[in-house]
Every structure is written in C-alpha cells, then in structure tokens.
Amino acid sequence: MEFKHVSVLLDECINALNIKEDGIYVDCTLGGAGHSSEIVKRLSSDGRLIRFDQDKDALKAAGERLKDYKNVTYVHSNFYAIYDVLTDLGIDGVDGILMDLGVSSYQLDNGERGFSYMQDAPLDMRMNRENEFSAYEIVNTYSEEELYRIIKEYGEEKFAKRIASFIVKNREEKNIETTLELVEIIKAAIPAKARREGPHPAKRTFQAIRIEVNKELEIISKTILDGVKKLNKGGRMAIITFHSLEDRIVKNTFKELANPCTCPSEFPVCVCNRKPEVKLISRKPIEASKEELEFNPRSRSAKLRIIEKL
C-alpha cells in the first residue's frame, strides 16, 4: 500500500518554525514527510534536517520522497530518544523541533495495521512493528480493572466499565483476535441510544488501546523537556496534538517552562530563582482553517502550540 498522508496545519507549522536556511531542524514524527519536505525545501546545503519515525514504512516512503536532498538524516526511533540521538550525532543545538502526534492517514487506512475500527484486521496498533507488545495482548491479557482504567483514562469513555466487562466475558469463550470482533463487543456494551449519538462507538476505546500500546502519553513531557535542552536560543518547538489528553500535557509542560517560578503569589519578588526557559508564541492553540477542514476532515481536532527558547 502506498504511504499517503495529508499533513495537518502545514503552512502554520512552517511559519511557526521560523526557518533559517542554514539551521538544523528536527521532525520528530516523519509520517508521510509532508512537513519535512516543506522544511528541507527552505534549507540551503548548509542546513540540516533530522527525521525520526518508529515506523519503517514511513521511513522508507519518506526516503523515496526526499531522495534528492542530501542534507537529511533518517532515524528509526521513537522521538523520546531525541536528546541521546542528537548527542550521538554530535549535535549540541538545533533551531527547530516539530512534533505531529497524530496517527498517519496511511496507518489508519492500512487495514493490516489494526488502527482502524472501520476495517477488519488483526489486533495490532503498533507504531513500531518491531515491538512485541500489541493491542492483542492488552485485549486478551489485561485484567478487567486494567482495561477499565485505560479505557476510562485514555479514552475518556463513560461506558468504560461496561466495555471492560464485556471484553473479559467474551474472551472467556475464545481470544479476541480482530478489530471488528472488538468493535462488535464494544457496540454490545454501549446502550443503543448512546450508539446512535456522537462519534463511532468504538472510537474512544480504540484510542485508549492505541495510546497504551505505544505509551504515547508517557513520553510527551519527557520529549519536550529533552528537546528544549537541545534548542538554540531563538529556536522554536511546534507540537500538533489531536485529543485533549495530549493537548493538556503539552499545554501544561509549555506553561511550566515559560513560568517556572514556585514562589507563593503573595511574595512581592521571586526568591526561588527559577527563570523561564521559553516564551509562549501562541497562548491559545492554532486550529485548522475552514479551507483545510473541507479537504482534510482529520484536521478537525488538531491543535498547534508553539514555544521559543530564551
């Protein structure tokens, strides 16, 4: 299957990075290389782009798309290793870091990857298929309490308890092996009235399982903190999120970096001596325009937040 992915908030991201032609930039989530291709077009031969992806399909497709550019370095790794990878490459400072936290259109549309609740496939959902831990293990081995916790916490699903209970009851007869098997179990757990309203009944549960498989939320804050350490003065970090859990982590981490003072509000002056490391470029997140929403509905939930290193 061809690796296709429509980049979200493309122009907004490029503007946010304030690209210098001789700068060093990091694209933490390569995907279909839409953002990367626009970054590298703006670089001279003295500039450099470092591109991460834990999905080998993405790296292969992007390598073909950007084969004419010799100033691109490809890294098969999760972006949580950003500090160590840059250090190993001999890079002390970069001028911009971009993180797109969404699942690519290719991963959603490629049935065999198991991300979609619209197509039948083995329960997988691994961003990095070299990892052994998949959605199958979660669905078939987690206790009812563990399933309830992740579906409630990561999916923000109000019927989490019923869904967890139905999963455990169904797997007593036989293991749950495919996405559509799981979808039918979720549908059975949710009252008919609720199924008829709002998004697809399996959307939140699939989101929760995907987050758990790939440990998505655990690594966001660490990556931001490690990435900021590598930003040059005036360098920027731009992050696109797609649901409230991610956005909350990014928002709060950015806020702590921009205002780290721990002194009580009644203190007339700061005595903790904790200085801001960054400034917020956008106090409110940037969202997709009406025009973008028309040709790319998946951008509807996207939010872009930006900081600049002081």
Curated annotation (Swiss-Prot):
UniProt xrefs under Gene3D superfamilies: Putative methyltransferase TM0872, insert domain, Vaccinia Virus protein VP39
InterPro entries associated with the record: RsmH, SAM-dep_MeTrfase_MraW_recog, SAM-dependent_MTases_sf
SUPFAM superfamilies named among the record's database cross-references: Putative methyltransferase TM0872, insert domain, S-adenosyl-L-methionine-dependent methyltransferases
Catalysed reactions listed for this entry: cytidine(1402) in 16S rRNA + S-adenosyl-L-methionine = N(4)-methylcytidine(1402) in 16S rRNA + S-adenosyl-L-homocysteine + H(+)
A GO term, aspect molecular function: rRNA (cytosine-N4-)-methyltransferase activity
Transmembrane segments annotated in the record for this chain: none
Function field: Specifically methylates the N4 position of cytidine in position 1402 (C1402) of 16S rRNA.
Protein's name according to its UniProt entry: Ribosomal RNA small subunit methyltransferase H
Natural source organism: Clostridium perfringens (strain 13 / Type A)
Lineage of the species this protein comes from: Bacteria, Bacillati, Bacillota, Clostridia, Eubacteriales
